[in-house]
From Swiss-Prot:
It comes from Bacillus subtilis (strain 168). The gene is ylbC. This is Uncharacterized membrane protein YlbC. Residues 231-342 form the SCP domain. Residues 35-44 have a biased composition (Polar residues). The chain crosses the membrane at residues 7-27.
Length: 346
């Protein structure tokens, strides 16, 4: 009888514990699988805190757009994005290439490359060793926004080529040129914009904030302006390496767009199309006169500048970007599919 009573007591304790777990257990984490999973080390986040700069380009973050025009003047053009903000583009060649993201008259993101960028506390062109010496990079970064918690997890490749660190209240992505071992460019976000773009795999509690849906008509404008941004940044990189700028070639751009469109519609990623063949086949079909040609393709980057930085860190794509023989470029973007076609005229 005593054994039966003891068993009943144990059973009641187990049931009570289960009920308590269901009612008071922690909120479950959710995972958004936009990139490959990577295990994080919670203790690695501690380190030297970087404070918000009071001067330089990064000091624009969170400011009214009027502050930008006071310092930089009117933008060369204003490009739409897929993330609610508009890009204000300032292109001064190899010395300064800047895109300022403005939403509701407030700076929410920026991208910058060039030899004469004041990016305090960072310096574009600085060696990777110096960057990592002064900036502790963890395998993840945490974001808190409106009661939601996000942990963005970095792969080994992310850490080496495009890690993000917290600077004051903003997040700064550091694009590294792994072949030269230098800081190539920077991108800054406020918390909301960082979550909207999700440049890494994210584990989160709460709501996964997303940008507003983009109409087909707006996508066409985004794609066209992304093509211009890719041309701009490609030329910035070429001039930094002592090469001539590439001229835009519209027939080549139409061939490039056709390939991006074909990849999207037929759900593949390759330089060879089952329907339209190789690059040579496609250029000839498009009546493009060329002596030499090359092609870069990319998929699922957040935007044009991100795709260019990805090409820069891939040996084969980098060779095309920095090939001194090429004279003209055509770019075609269809949603998250990017194609660069390089040619040398006869």
């Amino acid at each position: 009888m005593k054994n039966i009573l003891r068993a009943m007591v144990i059973l009641l304790i187990i049931c009570g514990t289960y009920v308590l777990f269901i009612q008071y257990g922690s909120v479950p984490e959710k995972k958004s699988n936009d990139s490959e999973p990577q295990v994080s080390n919670e203790e690695a986040q501690s380190g030297k805190r970087i404070h918000m700069p009071t001067s330089g380009l990064l000091s624009f973050m969170g400011k009214h757009a009027d502050e930008v025009t006071k310092k930089l003047g009117e933008p060369e053009r204003i490009d739409p994005s897929a993330y609610d903000y508009d890009w204000w583009v300032y292109n001064q060649g190899k010395d300064q290439y800047i895109q300022i993201g403005v939403l509701n008259n407030k700076v929410v993101t920026l991208f910058a490359s060039g030899n004469d960028i004041n990016a305090k506390p960072f310096k574009i062109g600085e060696s990777t060793g110096e960057v990592f010496k002064t900036t502790q990079v963890a395998p993840f970064v945490n974001v808190e926004y409106k009661g939601n918690s996000y942990r963005f997890e970095f792969s080994e490749e992310d850490i080496n080529t495009r890690p993000t660190v917290k600077v004051g209240k903003m997040y700064v992505q550091l694009y590294m040129d792994k072949f030269e071992g230098k800081l190539s460019s920077i991108r800054a976000f406020d918390a909301q914009t960082f979550v909207k773009q999700r440049p890494y795999e994210v584990v989160y509690r709460g709501e996964l904030i997303k940008p507003k849906a983009v109409s087909d008509e707006k996508w066409k404008k985004i794609q066209t302006t992304s093509e211009k941004q890719i041309l701009d940044l490609t030329n910035v990189i070429r001039v930094k390496h002592g090469l001539a700028k590439l001229e835009w070639d519209q027939p080549t751009a139409e061939v490039a767009f056709g390939h991006s469109e074909d990849m999207k519609e037929n759900n593949y990623f390759s330089h060879v199309s089952k329907k339209y063949g190789s690059l040579k086949d496609r250029l000839e079909e498009g009546h493009v006169d060329f002596q030499q040609a090359g092609e870069n393709i990319a998929y699922n980057y957040v935007d044009g500048p991100a795709a260019v930085e990805g090409w820069l860190n891939s040996e084969g794509h980098r060779k095309a970007l920095l090939n001194s023989d090429y004279t003209h470029l055509g770019v075609g973007v269809d949603r998250k599919y990017y194609t660069q076609n390089f040619i040398k005229r006869w």
